[in-house]
Every structure is written in C-alpha cells, then in structure tokens.
Design a protein with these regions (language model features):
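Flexible gly/pro/ser-rich segments immediately N-terminal to CXXCH heme-c attachment motifs
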Residues: 102-105, 139-141, 168-174
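Extracellular beta-strand-rich, repetitive "passenger/adhesive" scaffolds
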Residues: 13-19, 48, 142, 174
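Long hydrophobic alpha-helices with heptad-repeat/coiled-coil character
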Residues: 50, 60-64, 72, 163, ...
Length: 197
C-alpha cells in the first residue's frame, strides 16, 4: 500500500552494498492539503536498488511506483528541492515518479538527478497493461522540468511506456530557463510497442 510522506526521506547505503527496497501495489505518496502541506526538501535514493517483488498472482501493475504526488487543490502548492536516484537498479512495472492527474495546486521540483542507474520494467502482459514515463509529470500543476539531469544510465525493455518522460500536455509549465540534460545513456526497447505518442 501507500506510505504518506510528510518529511524529506533518503534511502542510503555504502557503495558496493546495494540493498533492495521492495515496493508492491503502492509506494510513497505526497498529498498536500489545505492547512497540511508537507515539508519535503528532498527525496533521495543512493546505492539502493528499487524493485517490485516477484510473488504469486503476478505484478501489481500500474499501482506500483516509487513516488506518487497526488492531485491537490489551489492554495496547496509545494516545492521539493531535489529528487535524486544514484547507483540504483530499478525494476518497476509502470513508473518511478508519478504525477498523473492535473492539479490546481502546483508541485515544483527544483532539481532532478538520475545517475548510474539501470532501469527496466516488469513486462507481465497479464497484469501490466499501462506503463508511464520514468518521470511522468505531464499535466497542469507539474512544474518539474526546471533542472533535469540524466547521466550514465541505461533504460531498457519498457515496451508500452510513452517515452522516458511521458508525453507532456500544453498545460505543463516550462520556464524559459528550464534545462533537461541527458548524457552517456543507453536506450533499448523502450516504448517499442507504442505506435504513436
């Protein structure tokens, strides 16, 4: 199930240890509400793998994601300074950072850093019928494209995802100074089953 976040969180391990954080049918959720806005400065995963466990009954499908920022109303704006994943193997069925619903309240993430990660999906065609972008922030209220850096990472076999960053709608705020940098990355069989985006 979901774990509601109200403070910053970091999953850290020593280099070379690489423990695994298992998530199934849920994940961490941020849900700002009037008079109850979480104070979250960072969400960090470093030297920790993130996976959905293999269990009888198949994958949890699109209900499994690392961080979900829920729909919220006007007057509940929230700013997260950084979302970082470094040195991690990620095996999830649908997405890592999910902001699927249009919101009147604004969620701003100042910096997104993905480095030295190996990212793949769970391609269980019976239970995984929807996949989203690795970062899926495509609608109104998703102000996350300010400073995105993806380096030294491999993205592979996520067949029905609409691209690594989803397909943005015209309502997504993007400033003139925004920058998205991708360097030294490999993409293989990502979104190969989508006929259009």
């Amino acid at each position: 199930g979901d774990i509601k976040l109200t403070k910053s969180i970091a999953f850290l391990a020593n280099p070379g240890d690489r423990p695994t954080l298992y998530i199934r049918k849920g994940g961490f959720i941020i849900k700002p509400e009037v008079n109850n806005i979480p104070e979250i400065n960072y969400f960090i995963v470093e030297n920790v793998n993130v996976k959905e466990p293999i269990v009888s009954g198949g994958s949890g499908g699109s209900k499994t994601r690392l961080l979900n920022i829920g729909k919220h109303d006007a007057g509940t704006d929230i700013t997260i300074d950084c979302f970082e994943i470094r040195n991690s193997d990620i095996v999830l069925p649908s997405t890592v950072l999910m902001m699927n619903d249009a919101s009147e309240g604004m969620t701003t993430i100042n910096h997104i850093r993905i480095d030295n990660c190996l990212v793949t999906g769970i391609n269980d065609t019976k239970y995984v019928t929807k996949q989203f972008g690795f970062i899926h922030a495509i609608n109104k209220g998703s102000n996350v494209w300010n400073d995105v850096s993806v380096t030294n990472s491999t993205f592979y076999e996520f067949y029905i995802s609409p691209g690594v960053f989803g397909v943005l709608t015209a309502d997504v705020p993007i400033s003139a100074n925004a920058k998205v940098s991708i360097s030294n990355c490999t993409f293989y069989n990502w979104a190969t089953s989508k006929s259009s985006y």
